[in-house]
C-alpha cells in the first residue's frame, strides 16, 4: 500500500480566501491535492450530480416503478420499510410514493459510479492505466460522493424552507437526521483524505466496497419487494437474494470495514495527523453503529427466508391476506396480476372486496 503524505495542516487553506488560484484543466482532471483544486472539484461535482440525480435518474426510476407489474406490492413493502426503519410514512398517494422512493434509489447510481472509479486503485489494477490516473479516479470518487451529498442536503433544506407542506413531507426530521449521519463521512473525510493521502489504496478499496455493496444490496432488496415468497419459484429467488446480501454485508460492513477503518485511524495517528484523525473518528463511529443495524437486519432476513417453506404454513396465508387487505385499504382495489395469490393452484388472478368489514377473496 503506497501512501503519500503531501501537506501539513496549514496547506489545506493555503490559497484561501484571498489567494485562490483558478485551477487548470489538467489539475482538475488529475484531482491535484491542493485546497483550490479540491474545493473547485467539490463544487463541480455538486452541480453535476444535482442535474443527473434530479433531471435524469429520478424521472427514469419513477417511470420504471410506474410500469412495474407488481407495483402495488412493491410500493407497499417500500412504505413499510421506511416506516419501520426511520419512522417515515411516505403517504398513501401513489405518485408521491414512487417519487419518494425514486429520490432515495437514484443515489445508488452515484454509488455505482463511485465504486467503479475506485476499483482500479483499490484492487491493484492501477498499473494498467497511465501513471497517476487510477489515483486521480479514486480521488474523483471521493469528491463524487461529496458532491452528491452537498447537493442532496442543500436541495432538501431548500424544500423544507420554501417547499411548503409537500416539501416538509418529503423531508421529515427522521429522514434528515438519517441522511446527516450518513453524510458526515464525506463531509469530514473526502477533501482531507485526497490532500493528505491521495495514494492510499486501502481507503480507495474501502470506499469501493462500501458503495458497491450498498448499491448491490439495494438492488436485491428492491427486487425482493416484487416477489411473493408463498410461490416456490419466488421463494428460491428470495433465498438467493438474501444470501447475496448477507455475504456482501458481512464482508463489506463487518470484516473488511473493521480492518480498513482501524488501519486508517492508526495510520493518521502514527503520522501525528491529529486533525485528520479527529475528522475520521466521528464518521467511523456513526458508520460502525449503522453497520451493526445493517448486519443484524441482513442476518435476520437470511435466517428467516432460508428456514421458510412455501405453501405449507398458515402464517404465510395470513400474511398474504393482510397484505392484500392493506393494499385494498390504501388503493380501494387490487389490480389483477399485481399481487399474486398465496397458492398457485388458486389461480393467477385475485380480486379483493370488502363485505361487512371482512375481506373476502375470489379467484378470477
Would you name each region that the model predicts?
Residues 2-209, 230-340, 361-364:
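Membrane-helix and juxtamembrane interface regions of eukaryotic multi-pass membrane proteins
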Amino acid at each position: 500500500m503506497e501512501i503519500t503524505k503531501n501537506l501539513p495542516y496549514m496547506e489545506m487553506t493555503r490559497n484561501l480566501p484571498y489567494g485562490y488560484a483558478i485551477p487548470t484543466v489538467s489539475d482538475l482532471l488529475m484531482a491535484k491535492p491542493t485546497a483550490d483544486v479540491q474545493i473547485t472539484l467539490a463544487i463541480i461535482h455538486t452541480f453535476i450530480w444535482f442535474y443527473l440525480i434530479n433531471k435524469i435518474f429520478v424521472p427514469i426510476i419513477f417511470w420504471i416503478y410506474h410500469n412495474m407489474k407488481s407495483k402495488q406490492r412493491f410500493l407497499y413493502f417500500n412504505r413499510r420499510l421506511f416506516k419501520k426503519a426511520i419512522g417515515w410514512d411516505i403517504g398513501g398517494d401513489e405518485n408521491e410514493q414512487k417519487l419518494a422512493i425514486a429520490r432515495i434509489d437514484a443515489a445508488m447510481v452515484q454509488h455505482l459510479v463511485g465504486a467503479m472509479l475506485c476499483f482500479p486503485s483499490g484492487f491493484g489494477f492501477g498499473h494498467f492505466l497511465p501513471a497517476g490516473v487510477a489515483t486521480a479516479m479514486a480521488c474523483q470518487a471521493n469528491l463524487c460522493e461529496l458532491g452528491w451529498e452537498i447537493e442532496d442536503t442543500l436541495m432538501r433544506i431548500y424544500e423544507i424552507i420554501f417547499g411548503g407542506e409537500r416539501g416538509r413531507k418529503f423531508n421529515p426530521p427522521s429522514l434528515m437526521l438519517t441522511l446527516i449521519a450518513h453524510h458526515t463521512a464525506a463531509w469530514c473525510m473526502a477533501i482531507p483524505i485526497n490532500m493528505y493521502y491521495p495514494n492510499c489504496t486501502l481507503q480507495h478499496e474501502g470506499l469501493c466496497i462500501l458503495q458497491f455493496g450498498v448499491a448491490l444490496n439495494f438492488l436485491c432488496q428492491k427486487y425482493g419487494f416484487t416477489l411473493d415468497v408463498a410461490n416456490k419459484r419466488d421463494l428460491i429467488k428470495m433465498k438467493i437474494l438474501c444470501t447475496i446480501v448477507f455475504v456482501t454485508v458481512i464482508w463489506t460492513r463487518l470484516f473488511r470495514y473493521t480492518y480498513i477503518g482501524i488501519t486508517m485511524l492508526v495510520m493518521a495517528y502514527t503520522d501525528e495527523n491529529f486533525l485528520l484523525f479527529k475528522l475520521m473518528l466521528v464518521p467511523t463511529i456513526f458508520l460502525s453503529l449503522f453497520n451493526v443495524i445493517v448486519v443484524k437486519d441482513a442476518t435476520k432476513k437470511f435466517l428467516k427466508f432460508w428456514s421458510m417453506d412455501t405453501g405449507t404454513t398458515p402464517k404465510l396465508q395470513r400474511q398474504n391476506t393482510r397484505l392484500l387487505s392493506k393494499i385494498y385499504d390504501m388503493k380501494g382495489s387490487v389490480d389483477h396480476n399485481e399481487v399474486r395469490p398465496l397458492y398457485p393452484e388458486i389461480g393467477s388472478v385475485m380480486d379483493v372486496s370488502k363485505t361487512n368489514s371482512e375481506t373476502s377473496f375470489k379467484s378470477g
